[in-house]
Every structure is written in structure tokens, then in C-alpha cells.
Amino acid sequence: MNRSRRYSVTAIGTAFLIAGMILSMDGCRRSSVNRIRITIWHQDRIDVRVVLQAQLDRFMKLHPEVRVEQLFKETEELRSGFIIAALAGQGPEIVYGPSDQIGPFEAMKIIQPLEKLFDSAWLSQYDPIGLTWYRGHLYQIADKLGNHLTLVYNKKLVPVPPSTDEQLEAIGRKLTFGPDGTTRTGRYGLTWNYTEPFFFIPFLTGFGGWVMDDSGRPTLDTRATVEALKFIKRIRDVDKIIPNEADYNIADILFKDGNAGMIINGDWSWSGYLKAGLDIGVAPLPKITSTGLWCGTMVAPKGFSININLPEEKKKWVLELIRFLMLEENQLESTKELFTMPTDLSLQQSEFVQQNEILRNSKIQISHGRPMPVVPELRAIWDAMRPSYQDVLAGTKTPEQAAHDMQVLAEQRIRDMNE
């Protein structure tokens, strides 16, 4: 074979090889393009994301034709971003979070009713509190129950947790001032993010109050609000068992560093304290002696809602993904790693949950709580409570005046919201 013919054959062979590679690459691109893509927006912390990703990876291994991506967003960014995107006909297929976002999303008509998408027999496996119904429709299916506050205590400093407000104050004084009751020890008996209204709720309920009635009207100008405000101000200014100032981060650091014996914090914090090497206990918040009522927190399931704009070709896979993430083994994995309360009824009665001290006491606290309202008016109430509550702490307003002003401002904000 002459040189020119050899070159010709070589060139033709090379051309076929390149063409084959191009076709193969094009086929891969088409395969990637043709995969069903599902996106989940959430506001969960890093350790929750790690568990979720492991579960998503298992789902994608079972279903290679589907690609699922999780995307973290801060709470306000998620809510406003989802509203804007969904109103424009876009956004993630699934939005995950606490139940209080359901009211605003339903008002905008940007999430789908779920009761006809999932079989009632399948739904019956889960705690009814984890199924968020609003205005006659099911809008969220939760895999985690709680998002609630409890009393967390350092067992080295507090061997036995208090069960009443009087015991809380007594232990707090001993930790803060020592046996003689006068010399500061350099630590506080108790700390928490008490300047925020959400963290005020346990004492409001302990004195017999709540934020709204069944019709969504604020119920802040009450004796319960006044007494709860007085209690918090007293343990700070008279008993001096809590810091003079404390936001969430300050309280968290004080407790982690052993400079506070107890902290009021949510179920999201427990795994972090354990990983930091603290020997912690979790206990129900105390009973108020004068009322005989337990300090109850707002309880909010965290779960899945579906975008109103979900394309028909993705519906099958979105439903399959939610069913997969709700499986007993996946909820158990989350419970073991994160100490979250599962919504699967059989898991709630399982040996692991019943024998784990943290989860057992978490369940008791949940039973003392009330579901967080999902109506949009709740946001107006939070915003109305904050300035007067902080005025009481600053000493510029009496508890009585603050309760009155909270009510007036909440009613005004709700009127403005509904105009």
C-alpha cells in the first residue's frame, strides 16, 4: 500500500473514531437532558443536609432516570423567593419547611392540595399533627414533628432538672451565686434567646395565654401576657439568674462553654450540643406553680409541599420521592442522627424512641404544646409583639401597657395586611 493510500485509510479510520466519540457524547448529553430533574428548597442546617443527601443518593441509585438536587436557602429568602418564583410559573418542585409557611403559600395559591395525590391509607401511617390541613385541604406532609423548645441542661451542673418555675429559680440562684447566695460564680443558672417573641411563648402559655383565638384574632392584651412579662423581667432584674442581654448566639455560646447550667432551645440544637462533647439532658419546660399549667411551646411539623406549577411529566416522580423520604427506615435514620421526632406512628412507639431519654422527654414536651398557627396573621402578631416586649425589657414600658400596645398594633397590622 502506498503512502497516500495509508494516509487515506488512517484518515478515514480516525474520522469514524471521532464521529463515534461525538455520537457517544451526544447520546450522553441527550441522556442527561432527558433525565427528570427535581429540586427541593429547604432551610435546614448542615447536619440535616448531610442526612438528606444520603437519602437522595439512594433514591437516585434506585431511579437513575431521575436527578434530585437540594438547595439551601435562609428562611426569609426561601419564603419570598418561592412566592416570587411560583407566581412567575417557576420555582422548585418541592418546598420543605415548618408548617407556618403554609398559610402565606396558600393565600398566594402557589402550592397544591395533596389529599387526592396520596392514598388515605398511606397517610394514616403518620401522626395527624404531621399532616397540615388548611381551609379544607392537605398542603403539607411532614417527616419530622416538633421544631419545639425544651429545657436543655448540663448534667455536670444540673444533675436533676427542675419541674416547676420555683425549682427553676432555686437551681438558677444556686448556679449563679453559689451556696451563700451572694457571690457570683461567673456563670448563669439559665440562658436563652429571651428577647425574641417565639422564645417568650412557653411562659405565655404557662400563665394561661395564647397568641390568637380560633378566628385568628390576636389575644395579647390579657393577664397571662402581663404575668409572663413580669416573670421574665423578674428573673433577669431581681433574681439575676439570666444574662442582662442575650441573643441566640450569645445564649448558645454561654451554654456550650459551660457558663450556663440550663438553656431553653429547640430540637434543632441537641445534636450540636452532643457533638460539642456536652453531657446534656432534655426535659420538659417547667410547670408554673400559680396556674398549675406546663410551659407549652408552639409545635410545628416540618415537611413537604408541592409547587402548583409542577409539570405533569414530573408528578409521578415527585410523589415517588416524597413516599421514599417518608419511609420508616429514612425517618429512623434522621431520628438517630438528629434526635428529631418522626411522624411515622410505628416509629414513635419503637424501642429506640421510647428508651432514648432525649426523645422520650421531647415527646412529653410536644404533648404539652400547641400546634403553631399556619394563618398569615401570625407574622403580623410576631411583628406586633416584638417592640413592646423589648420595651419592657428595656424598662421603658410597663407589662400592662406593653400587653395593650401589642394587641392594638397586631390588630392594626392585620387590617393593613388584609386591605
Regions found by a protein language model. Give the residues of each.
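Extracytoplasmic/periplasmic solute-binding protein
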Residues: Y139-L149, E169-P218, A260
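Hinge/lid segment of periplasmic solute-binding proteins
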Residues: S99-L149, V160, D165-I171, T185, ...
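Glycine-centered hinge/linker elements that transmit conformational signals in sensory
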Residues: I171-R173, S215-E245
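Extracytoplasmic "Venus flytrap"/periplasmic binding protein-like
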Residues: R58, L62-Y126, W133, K156-P161, ...
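Short, solvent-exposed loop/beta-turn-alpha elements that line the ligand-binding surface or hinge
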Residues: E115-Y126, D180-G189, G209-L229, K275, ...
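Conserved N-terminal structural module of periplasmic/extracytoplasmic solute-binding proteins
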Residues: N2-P104, I110, T289-G292, E313-W317, ...
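Long, aromatic- and glycine/proline-rich binding clefts that accommodate carbohydrate-like moieties
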Residues: I129-L131, T335-P387, D391, R415-D416
